[in-house]
Structure formats: structure tokens, C-alpha cells
């Protein structure tokens, strides 16, 4: 009920921020990704690998993903291809590499905590807006800091709060798949059978 299109086929899509669909694969059950990839990477990272096969290597692209597709394994796989990834992530997927980030209760609105892996190729950032959001990135960290406007219940007006660059870019670049869905809905071609 909370998904925009709960019915129909499940399709994994790689899209540009402007909604242009670059690649897609239909979910076909356990045969969607290889068993070897599934064991090594898990489903989310395996789908990232599958979709990124069409992305030219060594062009230093940055892929933005939601929490289902973001993990340390997917970031490391893409780094081997000189492709970067930024995405929200579930706490159980950050491993011991970046597990000492501050929690929701330790941060005030507009504050963040950043940890960088020993090889300095991956960083984890937790930023508190109304709730905290956890991101992993191999292409950008919290610097330079930007700002954003958010509604303050106490002041009853919009206030400016600091926002790490990784959050700013994630918000700016995500949404291409949803935009592509909207474009397709606007251009539906109905086929009638006799």
C-alpha cells in the first residue's frame, strides 16, 4: 500500500537523475542473479552488479542507491570498477568497518558523525534531521557542509540547519527511477485484444 505501484512485475532499474532509464532487469525469482553472486554479495549488491555491467568502467561514475542496494560489499565491488556508490544503508549492513557512529539519541538536529574506513575509500555518515539517516559513500564525505531549510515546531517557521555534502548530493541525485515511472505512466499505450 505504501509503494507507488504495488501490482505488476518487479523490475530493477538503473536511471539517470532526470528519469532516463539506462538499464533494467525483471525479477525472475531465484534466477535473477547467479548463485555465486548471491552467496558472495547478497541480493541487493548482486542486482547492483548486474545493472552496472552496462556502465562503462573507469569513467568514475557515482551510483546512488536506496537502503536495499547499499552495502560494504556493493561499494567494494564498484570500487574495483572505478565506479562509486552513495546510498542510505541499514545498520546491519555497515559491518565492523564503520560501526562506531553516533546513534540517534546522541545527535541533535543538524548534527552528524562521520567515520572513514582505514583504507580511506569508504565513509559512513549519520546525520540527524527529524530522525537520523545513515549513509555509506565511496565518492563524497560530509565536507563541504551545505545548509537546508527545515520546519521547526518550536519556532513555527523554517530554519536553516547544516547538512553534510553526502546527504545533499543523495537528495539531489536520487529519484530518477520514480521520475521514470511517472514518465511511463503519462505515456501508457493500451493494447486491446479481440
Residue ranges, per PLM feature:
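Acidic, contiguous segments within the catalytic cores of piggyBac-derived transposases
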Residues: 1-194
